[in-house]
Amino acid sequence: MLTRVKSAVANFMGGIMAGSSGSEHGGGSCGGSDLPLRFPYGRPEFLGLSQDEVECSADHIARPILILKETRRLPWATGYAEVINAGKSTHNEDQASCEVLTVKKKAGAVTSTPNRNSSKRRSSLPNGEGLQLKENSESEGVSCHYWSLFDGHAGSGAAVVASRLLQHHITEQLQDIVDILKNSAVLPPTCLGEEPENTPANSRTLTRAASLRGGVGAPGSPSTPPTRFFTEKKIPHECLVIGALESAFKEMDLQIERERSSYNISGGCTALIVICLLGKLYVANAGDSRAIIIRNGEIIPMSSEFTPETERQRLQYLAFMQPHLLGNEFTHLEFPRRVQRKELGKKMLYRDFNMTGWAYKTIEDEDLKFPLIYGEGKKARVMATIGVTRGLGDHDLKVHDSNIYIKPFLSSAPEVRIYDLSKYDHGSDDVLILATDGLWDVLSNEEVAEAITQFLPNCDPDDPHRYTLAAQDLVMRARGVLKDRGWRISNDRLGSGDDISVYVIPLIHGNKLS
């Protein structure tokens, strides 16, 4: 085991998986190279690149920055720019997509408001094939804008698939609740098919006395809507959207798991998406990409990063509860450094799943095993293998030269944050920034905000390209300039050698939704 671990640790700088830098296949893949691709590799469709342009963009020496040719291809005059890595993988493993989603109630679906109409439905499951909208005699649905970024590792397969299909899973999940969301004055029913009460959302539940008396609206009352128990939780509409996004991420991950036996879907990916629905932004993140809002020069974080360090306690607790997942090769405990055999019987600082601080424990044989989480900062890895703990894919990922699967420690669940556009009057320089970790590895939130607040005021407010140029400026600042000692940014710091993808989304368009 020690030899295997040394080999894995030696590959820390080679990529997110030990021994897989630049590879199109994850460890232990099910013969993926002999299977057809689920979707062909390419760059985001909204860039409008020809095949020749795609090939030219994959220049690891020049690293040309790609931007939108036509701003009308993205809603809200959104800006976008990207650049390929400096050679760590053959392809740019980032993927992006942006669409306007139309959500209609499924035909024949149970609804909370009988006799309401819904007009379009999917003619197939969300597998990206045969997707069309069919007219019927039911009500109008709702439209929402969708932006997404996927940062692939150990190949671009999972990122490409997620960029094509996740939006369909989101639409599918929203279809069951679209009529409920449109009726914001009434709290969601506990069971679909119940007629909602015509009362404000803040006065749904009965008092205990009314419930016991059997009065109007009480259990057993002959003239009122379904029973409302006084202990029933009040679920706001926003929680339904959050649940839909969480379910969509889970279904996307399950689809990748199912289809990897039929298609070559390499590696895994992080996922950062935004939907604008009924005047609110919902930002869902699984991985280490990041979203921030810059409003009047103020920075508003809209995501958290999920890494071995930030999720240490969750990972340790899982390993503590299910020690077989460690394969008798790892310890779930954390120590300041590797424990040496000569330290048996001595007391050393350690940290367990229930601790944020440190304590001393007597070193035992079990503590000599390799730690579940090893390394610091960007070099921290789960089982010396992967540096992100949430995302999609990675179903075949194993510890280097072993049969220990890492997927049980990885989660597809996103964190979802909400921003209410209607609460603010946004200016033309107020923006939402979405970017993969290639940007954030070298630029802080403050540096990005400073760059935006310096750049946008110097652009014509009526120039539709201003946000694309701002995205290009951010990518250029993070990539830097190629010098004798590699890519360098300001103050001669090392530039980002990773793939970089950036959206700059102007929030002024949200004013129209208020």
Swiss-Prot record:
It comes from Homo sapiens. The modification Omega-N-methylarginine is found at R213. It holds the Pfam family PP2C. CDD domains: PP2Cc. The modification Phosphoserine is found at S7, S124, S211, S221, S422. Belongs to the PP2C family. This is Protein phosphatase 1H. It is found in: Nucleus; Cytoplasm. Residues 77-507 form the PPM-type phosphatase domain. Gene3D superfamilies: PPM-type phosphatase domain. It comes from the Eukaryota. InterPro entries: PP2C, PPM-type-like_dom_sf, PPM-type_phosphatase-like_dom. One of its GO terms (cellular component) is nucleoplasm. The gene is PPM1H.
